[in-house]
């Protein structure tokens, strides 16, 4: 049994593994964007009134919705357009004039917030969430159509304008939505109901509730669509009406969690149920998507391959070569911007495969050297990395620093040193780390960065040891206070909206503590 300051880490990890195997959705935080699209597209679906109530409850004091630093633009437009649709369609009539007035006031406040947000978007570009430019273009168009419409008691407010996304939206609507990756955005395509090219997987079209609703159409569909209706009904019931950013991110949650825990040295027998689940999921095609309904991607595949290899289950990395562009790998096809974290995960998968003498060891080692050089070029001047799949630089920096340190080959010490200094310089007074405030997720990433790059040989820098110990103290206080419900803080992963994976966060926290518990230099520092 592994314990740390009275915490039975092995028992906690066993419970988490059982949860990760059982939970086929993995996302626990509802999305304002996705919920707004369901209000507009599927008023027939169970939970419609609750979704409207959720939008009203989530509106901020400034009239907007969503996260900070530009992340509010997409959810704000979605919520405003949804409420305007409710008013225009007459959904609020049955609830009486007071309810309609509440909705109208929310929409007008939202319109003013959207106009200000889009002024910023026009100046600095769209937020880094998935498909943001074309989503903004489509919703701006829809909001302005509502604002100019003849509906009684129409919402009044400033016109919303932005110059971004029109070309991307035109390509999507012109037929690009048929590309499997882009079916995820089917809700932006008029007349998409019943499109034969969209093929549901486990009921989900494009891994998105909004895309599925667009495919089902504005009226309750017939028996042939029963699997998709059932999927949406069950998904909305998890949150009492609202919907998450994806219909499922089960393989992301499982693969990343297994990788965190395997890297920390957790006994393979404890991880066996999760290991075997992922190995079985990987078998048919050699690649994995983030969740059912999405196309396979190099990132989820690489993390899975790495985690399995660490636990002695070697699988061929052949699927990864489909994403090789030369200097770096793409995450998906097509891709506009490469991902630093995905390339770091591919470096780890290929590096571990090469270290174990797999059949493609030579090719993997050569690719690992290329990726390490590319990651070094992408390191920011301050020593950290940023990534398109996550709002926090602590996520990307953990992935890149550890990958380069373990698998990048000789000559990478300066790159890793800069990353460690960057992490040390951003610790908060309470021992935590975080972009906007200290969070369990980001603190776990920072602690892992320090432990896995500075304590591999059994001794480490005392400054680094104390920083890691203070971070662990913060995490232990959270575990004692909240038990199984480790707060993940604000959603940080990038989908169409920001989203969180609580199981993954808990795995990262437990892995950080497990790693610290194996290092006397860290454990012996009392920071309680």
Predicted feature locations:
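An alpha-helical repeat/solenoid feature that recognizes helix-turn-helix modules
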Residues: 1-8, 24-50, 67-94, 116-151, ...
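A short helix->beta-strand "capping" segment at the edge of beta-propeller domains
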Residues: 8-21, 193-197
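Helix-turn-helix repeat elements of alpha-solenoid scaffolds
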Residues: 9-14, 187-189, 316, 320-323
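Buried hydrophobic core positions in alpha-solenoid tandem helical repeats
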Residues: 16, 55, 110, 114, ...
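Nucleic acid-processing catalytic cores of prokaryotic defense/repair systems
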Residues: 60-65
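Alpha-helical repeat/alpha-solenoid scaffolds of the HEAT/ARM/MIF4G superfamily
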Residues: 145-159, 317, 322, 326
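Edge strands and adjacent loops of beta-rich recognition modules
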Residues: 184-196
